[in-house]
A protein has these predicted regions:
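ATP-dependent helicase/translocase motor core
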Residues: 1-201
Length: 201
């Protein structure tokens, strides 16, 4: 293992993470869509070049994973554009519906970022691991993305809440609807922060 270059070391780690998440890692020369719930095919050819990993569920491409060496780490977001190109590329040997693949990953084998193109305002976020093939299948079966569902939160019932709590929860919900990545609730001591936090969940 010590004679491997950084790219090979990263690929070994990525292969292991994909397997841990339930993907069957395969080479492009020996694809078997009947092996396992989902297949991660290395160097799958597209009309813009080979994708590091093309993810298949039910013999259909559903996503891509762009692999980079670990030293890229904190700068991994710089390859998001490359991943997006593969998502819109036409895969070889299979019929394509012309739509971009919805699930995009960039990974070093240590750090993994994920973008769900079904989101109203797609943007990448760090995830602990690859999603399981079954999870992607469920999402594709009609389940809206979390960020999309957050746009349709039910109205708040203000009964039993103080005005400052109503304002805090209303502003938090507005932030969630806008797909903002962070929100801060600042309330005075004794104003019911704990109750507000529980109510907002």
């Amino acid at each position: 293992v010590s004679n491997q270059n950084p790219e090979q070391i990263a690929r070994d780690a990525i292969d292991a993470q994909l397997r841990d998440a339930g993907w069957v890692v395969q080479n492009k020369d020996s694809i078997n869509f009947h092996d396992g719930q989902g297949q991660a095919v290395r160097e799958y050819p597209t009309d813009t070049g080979p994708a590091d990993y093309m993810l298949f569920v039910d013999a259909k491409p559903v996503g891509v994973a762009e692999a980079k060496r670990e030293t890229l780490g904190h700068n991994i977001t710089t390859v998001e554009e490359q991943t997006a190109e593969y998502a819109t590329a036409r895969p070889k040997w299979i019929q394509s519906n012309g739509k971009p693949l919805p699930f995009l990953y960039e990974t070093t084998g240590v750090l993994t970022r994920f973008t769900d193109l079904r989101d109203p305002k797609p943007r990448s976020r760090e995830v602990f691991s690859f999603h399981r093939p079954q999870t992607l299948r469920e999402w594709l079966a009609g389940c809206r993305s979390l960020r999309d569902r957050l746009r349709d939160l039910p109205p708040l019932d203000p009964q039993g809440l103080r005005q400052c709590q109503v304002e805090a929860i209303t502003q938090l919900e507005a932030s969630l609807r806008s797909a903002k990545p962070r929100a801060l609730i600042q309330m005075a001591t004794g104003s019911g922060k704990t109750f507000t936090a529980i109510t907002s969940i």
